[in-house]
């Protein structure tokens, strides 16, 4: 029995044992195709639908029914000067954003702070806490202006990651959890919490609680999916 796949634009073609694809005229823009999978030799028994082959936005494959995307990396930014580091251009379809720290240090003792935004950085309404765990002791606190990292020493050089996940798309509520460590003091810094935005997240800002300590070492990058 033959098992051919036949592609063509108009009309109907049947052949014994074949899988027949029938394509109509495609739209003028974008890379599209459409087709019917004929289950048997009658024009009424078919599965119809548009299929998007490429989206032009770096996706491995996108369709009208299933959205597939590769993990997309931002551009790493050096954390060697300034009071804040901002990443913009996060697409509205992103459901998870990871903030990666490598040897990040600041000039003072104010806790580091991760903030999200939608057109502008949001600095209110955060719920959660931050903790430091060291070989000698443990301590915790909470901050409402962002997801705080309880590293309070200028000598600390933080490495690790914090993951933000979309918990509720209808309210644009994001949750955060993650940990970094400072090998110079044998401490780990654990952060968790949530925040609701008025619209889709499009940026991440990293600063300090007092807003005046400057970055002095390392780099930060983000990834989204």
Residue locations for each model-derived region?
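Short, low-complexity N-terminal tether/leader segments at secretion or assembly junctions of large
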Residues: 1-18, 54-69
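Surface-exposed molecular-recognition determinants
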Residues: 18-24, 29, 33-40, 51-54, ...
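Short, charged beta-turn/beta-strand-edge "cap" motif at the junction between a beta-strand
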Residues: 43-46
């Amino acid at each position: 029995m033959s098992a051919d796949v036949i592609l063509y634009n108009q009309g109907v073609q049947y052949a014994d044992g074949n899988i027949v694809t029938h394509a109509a005229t495609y739209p003028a823009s974008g890379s599209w195709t459409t087709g019917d999978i004929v289950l048997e030799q009658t024009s009424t028994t078919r599965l119809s639908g548009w299929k998007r082959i490429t989206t032009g936005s770096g996706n491995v494959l996108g369709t009208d029914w299933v959205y597939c995307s590769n993990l997309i990396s931002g551009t790493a930014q050096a954390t060697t000067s300034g009071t804040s580091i901002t990443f913009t251009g996060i697409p509205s379809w992103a459901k998870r954003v990871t903030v990666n720290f490598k040897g990040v240090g600041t000039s003072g003792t104010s806790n580091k702070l991760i903030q999200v935004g939608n057109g502008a950085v949001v600095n209110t309404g955060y719920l959660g806490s931050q903790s430091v765990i060291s070989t000698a002791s443990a301590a915790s606190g909470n901050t409402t202006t962002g997801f705080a990292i309880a590293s309070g020493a200028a000598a600390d050089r933080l490495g690790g990651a914090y993951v933000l996940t979309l918990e509720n798309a209808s309210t644009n509520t994001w949750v955060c959890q993650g940990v970094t460590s400072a090998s110079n003091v044998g401490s780990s810094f654990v952060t968790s919490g949530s925040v609701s935005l008025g619209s889709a997240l499009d940026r991440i800002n990293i600063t300090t609680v007092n807003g005046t300590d400057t970055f002095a070492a390392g780099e930060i990058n983000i990834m989204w999916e």
